[in-house]
């Protein structure tokens, strides 16, 4: 499978445009932490795991995660999640590694995978309104 096809397939899924199903009951629980913000809590995770392909220098599928505004805008196909609905997000499912191997993010060898606790923190940020 070509890299372009794999990349397109992932971003369609990650941006919520795929009919791909995932079992939301397998998502790590939402973090109990209150007041989760992009700058303080989420940006450091993205910087560590996502900026290599979705940062200031490179934006695969036009997805940029290095600012709150860009993250909320999403990539080529729009935002990857709906505020308040982390359990429905294929973006969350992809970093939780619940999608197919070519849809899970970050890809093997491209960044550090999110821990269950970090996925829970991402879920809390989305559920608390993405501030």
Give each language-model segment a name:
Residues 18-131:
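Aromatic- and Gly/Pro-enriched helix-to-coil junctions and flexible linker segments
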């Amino acid at each position: 499978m070509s890299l372009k096809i794999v990349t397109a397939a992932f971003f369609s899924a990650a941006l919520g445009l795929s009919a791909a199903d995932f079992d939301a009951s397998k998502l790590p629980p939402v973090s109990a932490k209150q007041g989760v913000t992009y700058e303080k809590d989420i940006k450091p995770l993205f910087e560590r795991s996502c900026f290599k392909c979705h940062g200031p220098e490179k934006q695969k599928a036009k997805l940029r995660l290095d600012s709150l505004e860009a993250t909320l805008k999403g990539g080529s196909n729009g935002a990857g999640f709906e505020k308040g609905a982390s359990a429905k997000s294929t973006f969350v499912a992809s970093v939780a590694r619940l999608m197919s191997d070519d849809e899970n993010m970050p890809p093997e060898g491209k960044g550090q995978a999110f821990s269950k606790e970090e996925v829970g923190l991402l879920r809390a940020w989305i559920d608390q309104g993405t501030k």
